């Protein structure tokens, strides 16, 4: 399934979160940014969760060591990480992309596997960092020459790789990781985040093809590219940018970009005018990308019950396994994501928002899943270990 629309190439139990936690979250993020300005990229503990659910999140979560299931990591590495360090998207023609490389680097840090981290990072540098800036080309195709035909970036991949480098610098004390993290984070802040428009800052999905100058309905954004747990960490690498403000703009969009009877966001959202609306030229669906929004909220420990409500409502009413892809205009499923790894996302969201213990299947990744559900499952495991150990019965 192609989760990256080809349009890039053309242009491109109850009351766990109180209503007041969002304000507390904003303050926590601001304090995190101030701390980062005082000591850029020095080792230290990540900021406290911006909103503290009754699931009792860890007060000082660390990514390093958060993936405690060594067997699950070995199986994932054997299936999806080549000897050279290429993370293979098994359901997408065997391509690789900046998203997958970033996820692989994060999981390697979480597993304490520096050797694999180095392999993935080395392949990423050699094959995706081929632009004239510090951002990454978004897609590498093994059966094409050149393998990178589209030099546009994907901002979620840029953010994930920069975040992984920040975590690696803290975990292993390598100044090279610190330097690389800063280079990428600075270009994200300068080139991809619209900070000075007189409106809340926006994260463009890529450098080309999404701005108001390039699209009649622009700017167009993708809320799943707001990788909320990354932003306080990027403040360590590039403290001159207001990452806390970017977090707040994303939280506001999660509340305002809700469409149709199910009140769900679409993958691609037009922010032209006073109100968000589904972007032109893309299916108006809540789908593969958008299912990550509650993952990132929960991982960051932010949001109120209202932020999680439409996702929990959708996933709590399922009459079959898997997650639905929803036509937002009609509020009906048009497809189902059947592989078991996807079920980790509702479990993590219910844990974060309601304190619901995760089911036994949450801790049992399946061996034969494709790259995307397998990756989301391990990310959810790491997030739960970092912030919601009480939901794991620990």
Please report, for each region that a protein language model flagged, where it lies by residue:
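Boundary at the C-terminal end of the N-terminal hydrophobic targeting segment
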Residues: 36-40
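Short glycine/serine- and small hydrophobic-enriched flexible loop segments
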Residues: 105-110, 160-170, 229-233, 295-299, ...
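Extended ligand-binding clefts on enzyme/binding-domain cores
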Residues: 62-63, 67, 71, 95-98, ...
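Substrate-binding cleft of extracellular glycoside hydrolase catalytic domains
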Residues: 129, 133-187
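N-terminal low-complexity, Pro/Thr/Ser-rich intrinsically disordered segments
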Residues: 44-78
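N-terminal carbohydrate-binding/catalytic regions of secreted carbohydrate-active enzymes
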Residues: 66-155
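N-terminal secretory signal peptides that target proteins for export/translocation
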Residues: 1-13
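Bacterial N-terminal signal peptides
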Residues: 20-32
């Amino acid at each position: 399934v192609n989760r990256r629309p080809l349009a890039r190439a053309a242009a491109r139990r109850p009351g766990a979160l109180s209503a007041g936690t969002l304000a507390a979250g904003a303050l926590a993020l601001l304090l995190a940014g101030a701390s980062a300005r005082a000591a850029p990229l020095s080792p230290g503990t990540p900021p406290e969760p911006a909103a503290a659910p009754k699931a009792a999140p860890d007060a000082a979560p660390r990514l390093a060591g958060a993936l405690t299931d060594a067997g699950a990591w070995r199986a994932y590495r054997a299936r999806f990480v080549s000897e050279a360090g290429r993370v293979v998207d098994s359901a997408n023609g065997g391509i690789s992309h900046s998203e997958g490389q970033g996820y692989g680097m994060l999981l390697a840090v979480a597993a304490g596997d520096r050797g694999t981290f180095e392999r993935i990072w080395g392949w990423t540098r050699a094959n995706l960092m081929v632009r004239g800036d510090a951002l990454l080309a978004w897609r590498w195709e093994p059966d094409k020459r050149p393998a990178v035909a589209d030099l546009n970036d994907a901002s979620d991949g840029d953010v994930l790789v920069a975040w992984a480098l920040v975590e690696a610098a803290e975990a292993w004390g390598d100044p090279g990781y610190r330097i690389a993290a800063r280079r990428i984070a600075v270009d994200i802040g300068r080139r991809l985040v619209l900070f000075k428009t007189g409106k809340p800052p926006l994260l463009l999905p890529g450098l080309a093809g999404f701005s108001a100058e390039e699209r009649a309905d622009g700017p167009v954004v993708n809320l799943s590219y707001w990788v909320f747990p990354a932003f306080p960490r990027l403040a360590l690498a590039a403290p001159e940018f207001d990452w806390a403000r970017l977090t707040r703009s994303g939280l506001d969009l999660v509340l305002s970009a809700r469409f149709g009877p199910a009140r769900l966001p679409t993958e691609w959202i037009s922010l032209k005018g006073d109100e968000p609306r589904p972007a032109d030229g893309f299916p108006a669906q809540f789908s593969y990308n958008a299912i990550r929004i509650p993952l990132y909220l929960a991982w960051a420990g932010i949001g109120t019950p209202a932020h999680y409500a439409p996702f929990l409502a959708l996933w709590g009413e399922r009459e079959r396994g898997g997650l639905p892809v929803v036509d937002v205009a009609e509020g009906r499923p048009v497809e189902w994501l059947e592989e078991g790894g996807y079920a980790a996302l509702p479990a993590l969201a219910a844990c974060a928002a309601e304190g619901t213990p995760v089911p036994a299947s949450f801790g049992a990744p399946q061996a034969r899943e494709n790259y995307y559900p397998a990756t989301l499952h391990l990310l959810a495991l790491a997030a739960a270990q970092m912030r919601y150990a009480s939901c794991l019965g620990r």
